[in-house]
């Protein structure tokens, strides 16, 4: 329970930092990993069972490999770092509510909990386009072309004044809309060429760490229900 609470604190701090700057401080994931290794070492020596320290080390290594691949593929650096921290801190967790894949969890050297948290977080992220679509509909957006339907899934049709309130990537206006803009291009954040009353398409740019943090909270109760539906055993 201590490890879980520390992980939750780390994820909350990391999510706030990721929202503000799109980066997280290294002390968060390193702190999670170090504390996890220390706690598992203490538990192993006090109980005479060395499985906790083995699980912590193997969890860190496996999550490090996954995190590094994410970084190389440009999927997310901060998300990979937090995954590494979770791998060492809390590689396993008892699922009291739902688990159809229970036989797999006997392989204690695999960090099932961090991987499941990450998987459920990605699923939550996929729900965002559905939310954006219906939000645009409720705001009176009436799509006529296929491109407009796609835009309703990836962005919001809002005024420039609204876009200035948050950290949003501007997709454009009219025929100049880009469905896949570069988040590293400063021009996508430049709203000076528009009037505050003009409407533009903009993406909320929600970092993956936010749904991962939410997944961290609900996964002990949700378990692997979503995964078991996709991959029935």
UniProtKB/Swiss-Prot annotation:
Main localization category: membrane
Matches recorded under PANTHER family: PREFLAGELLIN PEPTIDASE (PTHR36506:SF1)
Q: Where in the cell is it found?
A: Cell membrane
| Reported impact of residue 224 to A | Still able to process preflagellin to mature flagellin
- EC number(s) per entry: 3.4.23.52
InterPro entries, per the entry = Arch_preflagellin_pept (IPR054964), Preflagellin_Peptidase (IPR052218), Prepilin_IV_endopep_pep (IPR000045)
Coiled-coil residues: none
Q: Which gene encodes it?
A: flaK
Function comment: Cleaves the N-terminal leader peptide from preflagellins. The processing of preflagellins is necessary for assembly of flagellins into a flagellum structure.
What is the name attached to this protein's record?
Preflagellin peptidase
């Amino acid at each position: 329970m201590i490890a879980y609470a520390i992980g939750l604190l780390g994820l909350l701090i990391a999510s706030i930092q990721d929202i503000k700057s799109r980066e997280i401080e290294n002390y968060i994931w390193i702190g999670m990993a170090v504390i996890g290794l220390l706690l598992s070492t203490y538990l192993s020596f006090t109980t005479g069972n060395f499985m906790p320290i083995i699980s912590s080390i193997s969890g860190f290594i496996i999550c490090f490999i996954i995190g590094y691949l994410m970084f190389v593929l440009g999927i997310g650096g901060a998300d990979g770092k937090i995954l590494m921290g979770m791998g060492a801190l809390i590689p396993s967790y008892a699922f009291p509510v739902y688990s159809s894949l229970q036989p797999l969890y006997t392989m204690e050297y695999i960090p099932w909990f961090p991987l499941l948290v990450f998987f459920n977080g990605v699923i939550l992220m996929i729900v965002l386009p559905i939310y954006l679509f219906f939000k645009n509909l409720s705001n009176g957006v009436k799509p006529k072309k296929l491109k407009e339907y796609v835009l309703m899934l990836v962005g919001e049709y809002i005024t420039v004044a609204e876009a200035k309130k948050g950290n949003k990537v501007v997709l454009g206006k009219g025929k100049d809309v880009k469905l896949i803009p570069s988040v590293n291009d400063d021009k996508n954040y430049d709203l000076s060429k528009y009037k505050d009353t003009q409407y533009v398409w903009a993406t909320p740019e929600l970092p993956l760490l936010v749904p991962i943090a939410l997944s961290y909270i609900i996964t002990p109760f949700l378990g692997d229900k979503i995964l078991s539906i996709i991959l029935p055993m």
